[in-house]
Amino acid sequence: MQLRPFGHQVRGPAGQGAVQHRAGGDVDLGGSAYSAGLEAPIKHSHDFRCWPGYGESVPAPRREDSSPVSPYIPLPAGLAEPRSSAAAVFDRIAGLYDQARPGYPPEAVTDLVRICGVGSSSRVLEIGCGTGQLTRDLAPNGARIVCVEVGSSLADAARANLGRWPNVEVVTTRFEDLDVPTSSFDLVVSATAFHWVDPEVSYAKAAALLDEQGKLALLTNAHSRGGTHIDERIAEPIRDLHRRLAPEVGDWDFPTAEDIQHRAQAGGDIASVWARVERRLSDPPPLEQLFGQPTVKTYPWLATYDRNAYLAMLSSQSSYALMDQVRHDELLASIGTLIDEKLAGTVTKEYVTVMAIAARAPG
């Protein structure tokens, strides 16, 4: 791949359902293609105010805290391999993904920029940009950003969202297949996407593409046990629904913010940290020769959803989007009814954003 000259304007096709993000985190759909299956506007807000311990390694405090959405889109036959299936389903729900997926706390982005020294002369590679959830916060710093996204619809949405920044380029390809010279970047970053890359390739290739002072940064929004989404009025009925309709999704049990922070801060190289954070069962590859010890930071925060936005957020996750339509729609309709009847149509959900940053090892 030849990297295009800096300053070339990247634009997606006009009128392809771009999403306008307003102050406070609300979203407004700009095209009917992005609201297919949604019978009411999706609105949500993210409370990124700093809880005690926000951005640090201390425990976070305990807190008390219309019609069903059916964005189901059938998948093509023959997708048996999990990575391929997930990539395909995200691409087929690109509009829903764009409007429903949360971004990242401003403090996390500020720390990322500060620790990695991101500025106008920086060269950044983002792996799995989605529709630009993190990119839109990095782009104003002026760094040259090459975004890799395997899904063509996701990439088109990212181009539409990021077209105002001439320093951003979106490339439709797998990271494994990206062909660029070694030592091309100062920062390789991936937000809630690195686990979809082949682990035999991910860390080694990221290290090879970094220059001598370069850094790898990984972020994710971990689901935690805080907010009314685990309120006793709805939690057990939702668990019963999952046991009956979606046993493959899980049992509606979430770790506490303290548990997530403890796993993140338990030491080891960046691959070990990330395997614990994402609760992966397989052993990560040893990275002694690739990266130094990571800096790890955590950011607990709270999101507030109306019922449609909450159901859309669930549907944007691969485990729900891969369900067959009948079970998917029954599950979401039942959860929506519980939210309406028990929580007056509004639900809060706690996340813990985890960020791990490691410098490329010398040599």
Spans of features found by a protein language model:
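A short glycine-rich, Lys/Arg-flanked "PGG" loop and its adjoining helix->strand segment in the class I
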Residues: 201-212
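A short acidic, Gly/Pro-enriched loop at the edge of an enzyme's catalytic core
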Residues: 177-187
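Conserved class I S-adenosyl-L-methionine
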Residues: 59-119
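Conserved beta-strand/loop positions that form the S-adenosyl-L-methionine
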Residues: 127
